[in-house]
Amino acid sequence: MANKIDFGANSHVETPSKSEAFFIKFKKQILIAVVAIIVIVAGAVLYNAYVSGPREDKASTALAKGQQYFNQEQFDKALNGDGASYAGFIKIASDYSGTDAANLANLYAGLCYANLGKWNEAVTTLEKFSSKSDAIISPAAMAALGNAYANTGNIDKAISALKKAADMADSKAADDTNNSLSPTFLIQAAELLESQNKSDEALKIYEDVKKKYVNSQVVQSSEIDKYIERITEK
């Protein structure tokens, strides 16, 4: 029988009890990998990839303080401003609409909402982010959107987004294989498939990860075998 799970302030969806176990396990840590990626590449890399040119200077200056609050996990201040000189990612995205800085502000804002447990707002804001042809930020942003979909009960959309994130990461990697990001995204997709009792589809993903991403940590450590065994031993 399905159980009712509260994924947000006003969002109640019916999901199988197996899904409930998944979200109880991952609700607080579902975005840790994605947020870590954003934090690691914040600053110079983000600036060079997304914000350049004189017309972006003012917007990028506004972003800098927000990045500091974000890195310090002061997500409410990063999102809404500090009541002093910093306006917040939401206002930056609005005030500088159409700029690369505003696009990046939408990504940060979506991640702030996610970390605050406001998943519906996270979905809406992350959907505003426009991907670029980069190897890290855009795949991570797509994965973040996938996790936001999952936490609002849109499991099919979540699986699709996570698979797309892996494809995006692979497309910019040597030999079309991103051993750092893609296995993480695909394993999340497979676990969601398991929560839908689609064990065969999940098993195929796990086996594909083991075969394709041989140099990844999850394969090198034999962690992937635990996922495979979990299904095959049922």
Residue locations for each model-derived region?
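Short solvent-exposed coil/turn linkers within tandem alpha-helical repeat scaffolds
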Residues: 53, 93-102, 116, 131-139, ...
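N-terminal positive-inside, membrane-proximal cytosolic segments immediately preceding the first
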Residues: 1-36
